[in-house]
A protein has these predicted regions:
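Periplasmic-binding protein-like
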Residues: 1
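Append "and occasionally in soluble cytosolic enzymes with long acidic Gly/Pro-rich linkers
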Residues: 4-132
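Periplasmic binding protein-like
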Residues: 129-179
Length: 179
């Protein structure tokens, strides 16, 4: 838990994930990039001062740290996946976490419904890209393949945070309307 509460560690995971490969598990190679969106709304959703929303977000985010410079929020591309940035963020996180007594590698339990081939393939893709970018000596994604009932009970139907005995779960949500 301590590692996931560290901003630099979360940013390392963010830059380590190959979203195109992850999407290809469901949408195929040709359709993989077509579904990619870095923001919840289209980057052209609204404008202010003659600039699209995506451009405004890029500018504001780049001002928060060098790691965000060069990140584009245009649709149909993955400008977040960057192994060099992932490693740089991990180096910062590792120093901070080791000073708190955290041991490496960090093991992250990731729950997935084993009855869904697509979800299992996506979980394996996530595991592969994160471990390849950051190194298994630093981060290991432990994919927990559960039955549908067990996965639902551990995630969707858990009554309290204490009942959620995992580190990561990927679900989907998007706005119903663009306004």
């Amino acid at each position: 838990k301590t590692a996931l509460q560290n901003k630099n560690f979360r940013q390392a995971l963010n830059f380590a994930l190959d979203r195109t490969s992850y999407s290809a598990q469901v949408n195929g190679k040709d359709g993989a990039s077509k579904t990619l969106r870095t923001l919840l709304v289209p980057p052209t959703f609204v404008q202010a001062d003659g600039k699209d929303f995506g451009t405004l977000v890029e500018e504001k985010l780049a001002a928060t740290g060098d790691e965000w410079k060069g990140v584009s929020f245009a649709d149909a591309q993955d400008s977040l996946h960057n192994a060099d940035k992932a490693k740089a963020e991990l180096a910062k996180a590792k120093s901070e976490l080791q000073s708190q007594g955290v041991q490496f590698p960090i093991h992250i339990d990731y729950v997935v419904d084993q009855s869904s081939n697509a979800l299992v393939q996506q979980a394996d893709s996530m595991k592969s890209s994160i471990e390849a970018s950051l190194g298994k000596d630093n981060v290991v994604i432990d994919v927990q393949k559960l039955s549908t009932d067990d996965a639902d009970n551990a995630t969707y139907f858990a009554q309290s945070p204490d009942q959620k005995d995992f580190d990561m779960d990927i679900t989907g949500w998007g706005p119903d309307f663009q306004d």
